[in-house]
A protein has these predicted regions:
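Short, solvent-exposed mixed-charge patches
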Residues: 139-140
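Short, exposed beta-strand-loop hairpins at the edges of beta-sheets
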Residues: 104, 109-113, 119-133
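Positively charged n-region of N-terminal signal peptides that target proteins for export
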Residues: 1-5
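Central antiparallel beta-sheet cores of small beta-barrel/beta-sandwich binding domains
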Residues: 25-26, 32-103, 107-108
């Protein structure tokens, strides 16, 4: 009897520790600024994210990436713009990625941390400790 109780406890503990139970960051996310919505997907072994819409895009669907520090990129439309790339790790934290911010045209080193099934924390840094953190909410 003791063996079956211990075996059951071990199975439950293993299931609770399983990465399969960790929240999946893929999906559509609401940003806290400018009504932005970003779709996070798997791109090979990494996570990437694309800007789907924002207040600026809703006002002008042809809004361009005018603040990009790379002049050759300024003609891109904001809709469909790659914002997140190269994040690896998991199951609850992904590091080593890049975050592009169309508001200032800068690209920053980033970390994505799942803080719940429907929330994540995105941290972008020029150089630590010069970082900014946002909490995003899952839409779907």
């Amino acid at each position: 009897m003791k063996f079956s109780v211990l075996a059951a406890a071990a199975v439950v503990a293993a299931a609770l520790a399983s990465p399969a139970l960790a929240a999946d960051p893929t999906g559509l996310w609401q940003t806290p600024t400018n009504g932005g919505q970003v779709r996070i997907a798997r791109c090979g072994q990494a996570l990437c994210g694309t800007l789907i819409t924002s207040d600026h895009i809703r006002a002008d669907p042809n809004q361009r990436d005018a603040r990009n520090k790379d002049e050759s990129q300024r003609g891109r439309t904001l809709r469909g713009l790659p914002m997140l790339s190269g994040f690896t790790g998991g199951p609850t934290e992904w590091r080593g990625g890049s975050v592009y911010n169309p508001a200032d045209g800068g690209t920053y080193r980033g970390t994505i941390t799942m803080t719940g099934d429907n929330s994540l924390r995105l941290r972008g840094c020029i150089v630590a400790p010069l970082c900014k953190t946002q909490t995003w909410t899952r839409i779907q």
